[in-house]
From Swiss-Prot:
E.C. code: 2.7.7.6
Name recorded for this polypeptide: DNA-directed RNA polymerase subunit beta
Function recorded in the entry: DNA-dependent RNA polymerase catalyzes the transcription of DNA into RNA using the four ribonucleoside triphosphates as substrates.
Keywords for this protein: DNA-directed RNA polymerase, Nucleotidyltransferase, Transcription, Transferase
Gene name for this UniProt entry: rpoB
Reactions the enzyme catalyzes: RNA(n) + a ribonucleoside 5'-triphosphate = RNA(n+1) + diphosphate
HAMAP family listed in its UniProt record: RNApol_bact_RpoB
Keyword Nucleotidyltransferase: yes
Listed InterPro entries: DNA-dir_RNA_pol_bsu_ext_1_sf, DNA-dir_RNA_pol_bsu_external_1, DNA-dir_RNA_pol_su2, DNA-dir_RNAP_su2_dom, DNA-dir_RNAP_su2_hyb_sf, RNA_pol_bsu_bac, RNA_pol_bsu_CS, RNA_pol_bsu_protrusion
Top-level lineage group: Bacteria
GO BP terms in the entry: DNA-templated transcription
Group of enzyme by EC: transferase
Record has Transcription as a keyword: yes
GO CC, one annotated term: DNA-directed RNA polymerase complex
Length: 1359
């Protein structure tokens, strides 16, 4: 495979042995694919599938009026174009959404015609606006009110039927109580359960339980029908004084009968009282016994299967399910009943559960049963016949109230063993009976219960599906209103637009995207955190679990997680196991189940075919691991192969294997697949490692890890933070803010411009206040192909993910500074800005309309010194580039204040300075404490009709100039292309005449055209009519392009100059962006990729750091005790390999310095790249490319060791040897302060370290005087509130134990909530008097009030 533009600049040495046959899929498909299915935007209305918006409309429409003479039908819908681009929405604080227009048809029927064959009287069709639908950006997130949000997929219980037992927890005897539950997609849940006495009960929506037979009766079944459905029958015929029973020999197994069993010829097979064995049964079958003579007594206690009626009198002698007694037998004999049926039950595997339940059942008719159900569902309401029937009908048999969904129906039918997996979305009588039958079978010992946590019983609801459900909710609300108004439609001649109010729909959609539990603020720390957030699968949320209720089993790793959900990446804490991450290759099928790919294995040979299997399908196959040994042709060569079958690991011969894993990294998620040597780390630490990578702050200069896994490129590409070429071509121009590409002719469609302009994002703020900045990688003249990286984004380096920095690390103790995982770093790391990051704070100032008049943004602020206003322009807004510190004014603002009684001093001031000083107060936006930085951008938003200030106009001008430049460049390139094509047409043509004394009959030359100004080319008159027409068409094309450019410019101008949509009451809004540069400092949290985290304890001068024999000081010192107990040995292997990578880079640098030719470099590079692992095709590179590659490798040869398929110990040693480094990875270090060697060799090497977003600057906080709580008058807590430190119970004990009474009193009164005391204290300190008078704490008053609230009068007696 040829290298891309960036790949060939720096090739990663890959140690993988297994050739990956399946490319890593696009990582955001789960989001983007789901939402595209929901919108079906580019599908013509006639061809739309029954899902998403289309399905929602179809499920609610047509809406009929109550009289059924008017009907509103749905025809189709289309989505308009969003008013603003994604970027504009973010700046203006708007939602990126498209207007939805629906074509509706109002049909009015003739009232005279009969209802059966209605005659259409009138049809009106109209497009109706139905609100706005938020659109997904190409990166898979949404912009809601200007902030980027992600809709997390939900893992919920699949609809269908599930059988389980209580594990013996309900009853004290430990008896297993079985239950079945029918879960619909929407509608009432139906449960069936056994009680300890073995009767079957039903519950609807977890209400009070009622007998299952009541439900069966409500469905219209009689006692007799119920018995015949659930039991086999035994026919009994009377023969003299004894009775003949139908004999099925198998039924007698294990029984002991009170009489002899004899064959027809009189031979006794089983004696009375003996147990019947399999041998006896064989003898009976051999003897051909069809009936069994039994005495009358044997039948007593058995149960009748059918009603017995005296044929002569019509009298009912016995009812179905009656137990036979001696009296009944006599009555039957008297009535001369010759034959009757019994139900067949036994204690072993034919329980009489339904029969027992029927005996307890008080109801006899369907209506009585329905009334009983009504009483349970609506307790306290008197039931009527209609109400009871309607309620029961609506519970499970009304498509509007109950929906199993195609998934539910498929799961339901599969579980009950039906062939056909399709069917109605409501339940049928047969469905309910089948479920009870299966439940009884399981209780009887046939079949087994289901595993609730099996991924075949849990499905994923993605964005599209959840949005569709919300949309349907909105439509149902609209439907009620429409139905009311439809009756007016014909009399008042209304149109569809007047019938529909789109508010409820847009409100439902807005609520879902804005405030649903699964609509989350996007984690935008770095590209990886964005990707993982979009691939997250949560079991929480509406219709899911809650943290408190979720038990251990739900959270645990399940065998079906293999290849579907990552067993490693999940949060620590209360959400552990409830929030998971999709595995790298996993995808979601049409039913919402997670599938994972496997390669087919036929007769022990791996085929090229790849099949995706869901958890249900996977169980029946034998699946080998990706690393199973195979020869060149793909034959499995081991005698026994490690396989998975039915969720268990086992060893089987190769010919039994049916599938094999696609890749070793199949089982882990994206974040875990970025950890090198993951196979050498303990799972708990790997979990921390994958979670901490998501918290890494993008550094000023990204540095790709020396030891990676090969997934870095995939994550960076799919995250969308880099600029990737949309079409191939040649780079025309590059600057820091944009890249212009002249597109190849063959990739340009006729209606598209032949130029792509990529505007780069410069210093934008992310959701986490980190900095998003893109910088170009290409040079003018470079040839780029589609998909090539043109510019790096945050935390990417040459198209690869780069979350941290490679540091030279030593594992050794150093003066106790690395106690308890502390980290010691060298001053050089700070000096070189290795971990310096830029954070961008957004500060907003509103100018509102108040009762006393409008607030004003200006630089004329009362009682403020000139120095304080020095950073503001005349409009009162800080200028860009200003360095600001806490307390500085960013936006000057004054608010009118009411007239107050003036003090003599104020009167004097007023007399001197005039009116202004008093009627407004200063409410400027100031820099808050603990924040300082540089102003990098200012945005001014003005409401329509409010005059724009000078600053707003300036910003507008700059934006317009930018747009103009882009359009001009686009036009310039298009124009050049047109003229080049025209030149080909004109050169060599014979002319009639033309400008610059061109004579008729002469031929046009290139020189002539070069001298003639381009715009005059069109004056040339050609002899050939065909060529003349071509000339005219080109002139037309140019004119069109010019007009199009002007139009585009006017549109953009109109957008820019229009007023902004601001919240009510806001006249003007100013946003100021501050860039804060944060160097690494003690207290910052750092970590590696293996869960090895720590806090920086101190920064040591370079000269004091331990140094190696060649004088190189190390960058960072880690505690060796952090490794053995944590069992994350991956970090040590990474350190060794990183050292080798750096050493090889140094050797390449030396070769370059000594002026070696490309051929020598090729030899050395070949030794590195092709000694082991994946082979690289260095011959495809030209000599210049080899030199450029070598130059990029000087700082270290990047290596890739994919998870579970990485570098072996031997390969690491080989690399160290090649780099002329000790193969044990250790070297002698010398103390930087004394110069003496340390006692033993130390493990040294390069490790990729991350700076996490837990910075000491964000946590450090001190309070002087600040806000107090309203009720208790105690200081608030926390940095956000500028709060104080709580002096708690244990702190009080500490002071008590020292007897520091006055300090204690001060703490509990004046420093806390003694309002008068603290005011007095303040005055005393100002007067230089340091005495303290403690008063009554406010919390004491609160206590007295609370005691009074209990009805106890309490008051303080004053002396």
């Amino acid at each position: 495979m040829p290298y891309s533009l960036t790949e060939k600049k720096r090739i990663r040495k890959d140690f993988s042995k297994l050739h990956s046959i399946l490319k890593t899929p696009f990582l955001l498909t789960i989001q983007i694919g789901s939402f595209l299915d929901f919108l079906q935007m580019d599908v013509p209305p006639g061809k739309r599938k029954d899902k998403g918006l289309h399905a929602a409309f179809k499920s609610v429409f047509p809406i009929k009026s109550y009289t059924e003479y008017a009907e509103l039908q749905y025809s189709s819908y289309h989505l308009g174009v969003p008013s603003f681009e994604v970027k504009e929405c973010q700046v203006r604080g708007l939602t990126y959404a498209a207007p939805l227009r629906v074509k509706l048809r109002l049909v009015i029927y003739d009232k005279e015609s009969p209802a059966s064959e209605q005659v259409v009287k009138d049809v009106k069709e109209q497009e109706v606006y139905m609100g706005e639908i938020p659109l997904m950006t190409p990166k898979g997130n949404f912009v809601i009110n200007g902030t980027e949000r992600v809709i997390v997929s939900q893992l919920h219980r699949s609809p269908g039927v599930i059988f389980e037992h209580d594990k013996g927890k309900t009853h004290s005897s430990g008896k297993l109580l079985f239950s079945a539950r029918i879960i619909p997609y929407r509608g009432s849940w139906l449960d069936f359960e056994f009680d300890p006495k073995d009767c079957v009960y039903a519950r609807i929506d977890r209400r009070r339980k009622l007998l299952a037979t009541i439900l069966l009766r409500a469905l219209g079944y009689s006692t007799e029908e119920i018995l015949i459905m659930f039991f086999e029958t035994i026919s009994v015929k009377r023969q003299g004084s004894s009775y003949l029973l139908d004999l099925v020999p198998q039924r007698l197994r294990g029984e002991s009968l009170p009489f002899d069993i004899a064959s027809p010829d009189g031979e006794v097979i089983v004696e009375a009282g003996r147990r019947v064995t399999a041998r006896h049964i064989k003898q009976m079958e051999k003897a051909g016994m069809k009936t069994l003579p039994a005495p009358k007594e044997f039948l007593i206690g058995k149960t009748l299967a059918r009603d017995l009626i005296d044929a002569g009198t019509g009298e009912v002698l016995a009812k179905a399910n009656d137990e036979i007694t001696a009296e009944l037998m006599t009555a039957l004999e008297d009535a001369n009943i010759q034959a009757f049926d019994l139900i067949y039950t036994n204690d072993l595997d034919r329980g009489s559960f339904i029969s027992d339940s029927l005996r307890l059942d008080p109801t006899t008719t369907p209506l009585e049963a329905q009334m009983e159900i009504y009483r349970v569902m609506r307790p306290g309401e008197p039931p009527t016949k209609e109400a009871a029937q309607n309620l029961f009908q609506n519970l499970f048999f009304n498509p509007e109230r109950y929906d199993l969904s195609p998934v539910g129906r498929m799961k339901f039918n599969r579980r009950l063993g039906k062939e056909d997996i399709t069917g109605p979305s409501i339940l049928s009588k047969e469905d309910i009976v089948d479920v009870i039958k299966t439940l009884v079978d399981i209780r009887n010992g046939y079949g087994s219960v289901d595993d609730v946590d099996h991924l075949g019983n849990r499905r994923v609801r993605s964005v599209g599906e959840m949005a569709e459900n919300q949309f349907r909710v909105g439509l149902v609300r609209v439907e009620r209103a429409v139905r009311e108004r439809l009756s007016l439609a014909e009399s008042e001649g209304l149109m569809p637009q007047e019938l529909i109010n789109a508010k409820p729909v847009s409100a439902a959609v807005k609520e879902f995207f804005g405030s649903s539990q699964l609509s989350q603020f996007m984690d935008q720390n770095n590209p990886l955190s964005e990707v993982t957030h979009k691939r997250r699968v949560s079991a929480l949320g509406p219709g899911g679990l809650t943290r408190e209720r979720a038990g251990f089993e739900v959270r645990d790793v399940h065998p079906t997680h293999y290849g579907r959900v990552c067993p490693i990446e999940t949060p620590e804490g209360p959400n552990i196991g409830l929030i998971n991450s999709l595995a790298v290759y996993a995808r979601i099928n049409q039913y919402g189940f997670i599938e994972t790919p496997y390669r087919k294995v036929v007769d022990g040979k791996v085929a090229g075919e790849v099949d995706y299997l869901s958890a249900i399908e996977e169980g029946q196959y034998v699946i080998a691991q990706a690393n199973a040994a195979a020869d060149e042709e793909g034959r499995l060569i081991d005698m026994l192969v490690s396989c998975r079958h039915k969720n268990e690991f086992t060893l089987l011969p190769p010919e039994k294997v049916q599938y094999i894993d696609v890749s070793p990294k199949q089982i882990v998620s994206v974040a875990a697949s970025l950890i090198p040597f993951l196979e050498h780390d303990d799972a708990n630490r790997a979990l921390m490692g994958s979670n901490m990578q998501r918290q890494a702050v993008p550094t000023l200069r990204a540095e790709t890890p020396l030891v990676g896994t090969g997934m870095e490129q995939v994550v960076a590409r799919d995250s969308g933070v880099m600029v990737v070429a949309r079409r191939g071509g040649i780079v025309d121009s590059v600057d820091a803010a944009r890249v212009v590409v002249r597109v190849n002719d063959e990739e340009t469609a006729s209606d598209e411009p032949g130029v792509d302009i990529y505007n780069l994002i410069k210093y934008a703020r992310s959701n986490q206040n980190t900095c998003i900045n893109q910088s170009p990688l290409v040079k003018p003249g470079d040839t780029v192909a589609i998909g090539d990286v043109l510019a790096d984004g945050p935390s990417t380096d040459m198209g690869e993910l780069a979350l941290g920095q490679n540091l030279l690390v030593a594992f050794m103790p150093w003066n106790g500074y690395n106690f308890e995982d502390s980290i010691l770093i060298s001053e050089r790391v700070v000096e070189e800005d290795r971990f310096t990051s830029i954070h961008i704070e957004e500060l907003t100032c509103f100018a509102r309309d108040t009762k006393l008049g409008p607030e004003e943004i200006s630089s004329d602020i009362p009682n403020v010194s000139e120095a304080a206003l020095s950073k503001l322009d005349e409009a009162g807004i800080v200028y860009i580039g200003a360095e600001v510190k806490p307390g500085d004014i960013l936006v000057g603002k004054v608010t009118p204040k009411g007239e107050t009684q003036l003090t003599p001093e104020e009167k004097l001031l007023r007399a001197i300075f005039g009116e202004k000083a008093s009627d407004v107060k200063d409410t400027s936006l100031r820099v808050s404490s603990g924040m300082q930085g540089t102003v990098i951008d200012v945005q001014v938003f003005t409401r329509d009709g409010v005059e724009k200030d000078t600053r707003a106009l300036e910003i507008e001008e700059m934006e317009l100039a930018k747009i103009k430049k882009d359009l001009r460049d686009e036009f310039r390139i298009v124009e050049t292309d047109i003229y080049q094509r025209l030149e080909k047409v004109l050169v060599g043509k014979t002319v009639e005449g033309g400008p610059a004394e061109l004579k008729a009959g002469t031929q046009i030359t290139q020189n002539y055209l070069a001298d003639l100004p381009r715009e005059r080319w069109f004056e040339i008159r050609l002899r050939s009519e065909e060529a003349g027409r071509q000339l005219e068409s080109v002139a037309g094309q140019l004119k069109e392009q010019r007009v199009a450019m002007d139009e585009k410019f006017q549109q953009q101008r109109a957008k820019l100059t229009s007023g902004h949509d601001l919240p009510p009451g806001v006249q003007k809004m100013v946003k100021v962006y501050l860039a804060v540069k944060r160097r690494v400092q003690p207290g910052d949290k750092m970590a590696g990729r293996h869960g090895n985290k720590g806090v920086i304890s101190t920064i040591v001068p370079i000269e004091d750091m331990p140094y190696m024999e060649d004088g190189t000081p190390v960058d960072i010192v880690l505690n060796p005790l952090g490794v053995p107990s944590r069992m994350n040995i991956g970090q040590i292997l990474e350190t060794h390999l990183g050292w080798a990578a750096k050493g090889l880079g140094r050797k390449i640098g030396a070769l370059l310095e000594s002026g070696e030719q490309a051929s020598e470099l090729r030899v050395f590079l070949d030794r590195i790249y092709n000694a082991s692992g994946k082979k690289e095709d260095l011959n495809s590179l030209s000599d210049e490319e080899v030199l450029e590659l070598a130059n990029n490798l000087k700082d270290g040869v990047p290596m890739a060791t994919p998870v579970f398929d990485g570098a072996s110990e031997q390969e690491i040693k080989t690399m160290l040897e090649l780099a002329d480094l000790p193969t044990n990875g250790q070297t002698n270090l010398y103390d930087g302060r004394s110069g003496e060697a340390f006692a033993r060799p130390v493990t040294v090497g390069y490790m990729h370290m991350l700076k996490l977003n837990h910075l000491v600057d964000d946590k450090m906080h001190a309070r002087s005087t600040g806000p107090y709580s309203l009720v208790t008058q105690q200081p608030l807590g926390g940095k956000a509130q500028f709060g104080g430190q709580r002096f708690g119970e244990m702190e009080v004990w500490a002071l008590e134990s020292y007897g520091a009474a006055y300090t204690l009193q001060e703490m509990l009164t004046v420093k806390s909530d003694d309002v008068n005391g603290r005011t007095k204290m303040y005055k005393n300190i100002v007067d230089g008097d340091y005495r303290m008078e403690a008063g009554m704490p406010e919390s004491f008053n609160v206590l007295t009030k609370e005691i009074r609230a209990l009805g106890i009068d309490i008051e303080l007696e004053q002396d």
